[in-house]
Each structure stands twice: as structure tokens, then as C-alpha cells.
Regions:
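Non-catalytic accessory/interaction domains
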Residues: 1-3, 33, 39, 122, ...
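Non-catalytic architectural context of zinc metalloproteases
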Residues: 1-50, 372-382
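Intrinsically disordered regions, especially transient/low-confidence alpha-helical propensity segments
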Residues: 4-6, 20, 55, 122, ...
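Short non-domain terminal segments
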Residues: 7, 21, 91, 145, ...
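Intrinsically disordered, low-complexity acidic/polar segments
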Residues: 7-9, 42-44, 83, 102, ...
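Hydrophobic alpha-helical and helix-loop surface patches within well-folded domains
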Residues: 26-275, 279, 285, 302-304
Length: 407
């Protein structure tokens, strides 16, 4: 057994049926797996069991996290008052997130079961072994675990389709929350009752904050940071700051400015202009970032009436902007900046100021920029594409998300 926060204790009693299986960990230990359901539902649990075993194998391979007990159980009942809960060794689910059969379940149902089973299992390390110091730090476990379950679903299915689905949810539900009277930072400053913490900003935008750090550090760098985080804080109740510090220290990468994502609310806006110089054969991207006023926080990059100003003054975000350049046929162009060729035909530009310029060299014709590839930051992007340029991106861009976005 391992120490756990008191909120993770669970005990279930009832008339239940059980599906059993076994999983062998990377170190050779055998773990007994049990899924308990109400009578008559047993035949619809096989997909959930497969998803659980896939989750356990994936977490070992991707993050080096092995399950720590000899028994893992799931209980699914029809009247559980939430979707699912990661109680240590005994996850509790609403039946709709466990049961699936070809006769009644859609592809979306199957994907949802797979994703939520993974999410609750992944909490064993990001939430249980390392938990939150207080509920203001909720995104420490939820934003991180949403990122992990998104990556799992992307690896199990279509990465592009998963990203499109995640961004659709963000834009349709979290962006309005960011723009409304209930707007709050990923790490909230205050609350009236505990449900105020369980928001799309804490979960979904929190996952985007984790994803941006993954983009800035790269897969290997992010894994190094995660390993250090677990090494330092296993068995502890910690903060978002502790997580960011582990990523910083493992990679010698300064994330001081990036921390503003945890304290500043609202959806940033990027306004981008592209200018081609035929004589110099250069293409310049001018990027301006701004963020609107939100409750209790004054925005930047815009004019304000004096009476609307608050004590909290937002500042420029640090964010990754993935881009590529296409020729008139839609072929990717080699990238060269400041006299240096860039390895590959995609570059991650790091934005840190309200206004910046990036100059690409040795271009014989005006390129078409493919901007914010894979939706590399949770922002509103504005660029003056023509219909012809959008059609070209939609049909020829190598970035599948941007092909969908341009359509």
C-alpha cells in the first residue's frame, strides 16, 4: 500500500457481477483487474477492460509509470452522481462510461469509454501518488491528466481527429467561459463553493497549458521533467508551481513568464500580418498579441476607459506558435532565419512580447503561411487569408489540423 489523501478512500457494497482479467507490468508483476457492474450488464464490460489494459501499457511506455498495487478495481453503477472518480485502487464510474456493446454504442461512445477509463487510471500517478496541496491547485492533477488522456486517445486512434475533437470542445465551451462573467484563471483566486473549481478552464484550458510546455520542451524534455516531478514529489501534496519548476530544472529552461497562464484569465488574441519583400527575398510575419478585460483583471493590447481599470494588469503571454510555409502549389518550403537553415519544414516560434517580427529568408516568391499548426496555443488567431489560400491549405497542407481548419 501507499499513502493516499483521505478523499481517495472508497468502499462499495452491493449486488454486483464481476469481470476479471490480469495484466503483467513491465517489471513482471501480475495485477488482478476487476470490473464490477449491476446484474445484467456484464457482457458490455469487455471494451472497458481492454481500455484499462491499454491504459496501463501506455502509461508504462510513454511515461514510465507502472501500477503500484496487485489489484485494480472499477465499480460501475447507474446512479453514481458524477461521471467517474479515481479512488485509489477502486475507481467508481457511472455505468454510461463503462458499458458499451456494438448493438447500442456508437464510435463516439466507444472512444468516450476508452478515454475516461484511461483518465481515471492515469490519476493513480497524477493525482493520487502526487496530489494537490489545496483545491486552488486542482489543474495540477486535472489539467495534466486531461493532457495525458488526450495523448493516449491520440495514440490509440487518429491523432488529427482527436486534436480536432479537443479543440472543438475548447472553442465551443471553454472560450465562452473565458469571455463571460465567470471567467477565471487556470489556477483560480477564489471560490464560493467547491463546484466552482470543476470548470472547463481548470480541466481543458489546463490541459492546453500542459500541452504548450510539452511543445516548448519537446517530448524528451517533457518526459525528463515529468520524471523529476515524480522523483521529487511522490507521496506529497504540491502546487502547480512545483510542477512547472520540475520541468524548468530538468531542462534548464526558463518558464517564469509562462507562469502567467496560471494567473491570467481570458483567451489571448493573435493578429498576424505577412509581408513579402521581393528585393530582399524575405517574408516577415508581424505578430501582435492582446488579451481582453476579464472580471478583476485589466487586459493588454487595447484601449481602456480609466474607470474600467483594475488593480490586476495583465502582461504578455509566453506561447508557442507552430508554423510552416507553403509554395503556390502547396509544397512545404525550407525555412531559414537569421542566416541559419532550420532542420525540417516546420518551426515553433516563441512569442513573449506584445509585438514581434519574424523574418524568413531566401524565398523567391511570396509563401503562404500555415499558422498555429496542431493548434499549438489556446488563442484566437486572425490572419487575412484569401479564399484561394485557404483552399490550398485545405487540400495540400501537411498539418492535418490546419487542413481541417481551413476547410
Amino acid at each position: 500500500p501507499f499513502p493516499k489523501p483521505s478523499y481517495l478512500f472508497a468502499m462499495v457494497a452491493g449486488n454486483l457481477e464481476c469481470l476479471e482479467d490480469r495484466f503483467t507490468t513491465q517489471s513482471g508483476r501480475e495485477v488482478l483487474l476487476k470490473i464490477y457492474v449491476e446484474p445484467g450488464n456484464l457482457e458490455r464490460t469487455h471494451h472497458a477492460m481492454r481500455s484499462l489494459k491499454e491504459s496501463m501499457e501506455w502509461d508504462e511506455r510513454r511515461f514510465g509509470r507502472e501500477y503500484d498495487l496487485d489489484l485494480f478495481m472499477i465499480v460501475a453503477v447507474d446512479d453514481f452522481n458524477a461521471g467517474a472518480m479515481e479512488n485509489k485502487g477502486l475507481n467508481i464510474f457511472n455505468s454510461r462510461l463503462v458499458l458499451a456493446s456494438p448493438e447500442t454504442a456508437t464510435d463516439r461512445d466507444y472512444n468516450l469509454v476508452q478515454g475516461v477509463i484511461a483518465h481515471e487510471y492515469f490519476h493513480n500517478w497524477t493525482g493520487n501518488r502526487v496530489t494537490c496541496r489545496d483545491w486552488f491547485q486542482l489543474s495540477l492533477k486535472e489539467g495534466l491528466t486531461v493532457f495525458r488522456d488526450q495523448e493516449f486517445s491520440a495514440d490509440m486512434n487518429s491523432r488529427a481527429a482527436q486534436r480536432i475533437s479537443d479543440v472543438n470542445l475548447l472553442r465551443s465551451h471553454q472560450f465562452p467561459e473565458d469571455a463571460g462573467p465567470m471567467s477565471h484563471p487556470v489556477r483560480p483566486d477564489s471560490y464560493q463553493e467547491i463546484n466552482n473549481f470543476y470548470t472547463l478552464t481548470v480541466y481543458e484550458k489546463g490541459a492546453e497549458v500542459i500541452r504548450m510546455m510539452h511543445t516548448l520542451l519537446g517530448e524528451d524534455g517533457f518526459r525528463k521533467g515529468m520524471d523529476l516531478y515524480f522523483e521529487r514529489h511522490d507521496g506529497q501534496a504540491v502546487t502547480c508551481e512545483d510542477f512547472v519548476s520540475a520541468l524548468e530544472d530538468a531542462n534548464d529552461f526558463n518558464l517564469k513568464q509562462f507562469r502567467r497562464w496560471y494567473s491570467q484569465s481570458g483567451t489571448p488574441k493573435l493578429e498576424i500580418e505577412g509581408n513579402y519583400n521581393q528585393e530582399l527575398k524575405t517574408f516577415t510575419l508581424k505578430v501582435k498579441q492582446s488579451c481582453p478585460d476579464t472580471p478583476g483583471q485589466n487586459g493588454f493590447g487595447q484601449r481602456h476607459k480609466p474607470e474600467t481599470k483594475s488593480a490586476f494588469q495583465k502582461e504578455a503571454f509566453l506561447l508557442p506558435l507552430k508554423i510552416g510555409l507553403l509554395d503556390e502549389e502547396g509544397n512545404p518550403l525550407p525555412l531559414k532565419m537569421e542566416g541559419k537553415s532550420i532542420n525540417g519544414k516546420q518551426q515553433t516560434l516563441v512569442l513573449s512580447e506584445m509585438e514581434q517580427e519574424f523574418v524568413f529568408e531566401d524565398l523567391t516568391k511570396k509563401p503562404i503561411p500555415s499558422l498555429l499548426r496542431h493548434f499549438s496555443a489556446p488563442v484566437d488567431l486572425f490572419y487575412g487569408y484569401s479564399e484561394e489560400e485557404l483552399a490550398l491549405i485545405s487540400s495540400r497542407d501537411s498539418d492535418e489540423f490546419n487542413r481541417w481548419e481551413a476547410g
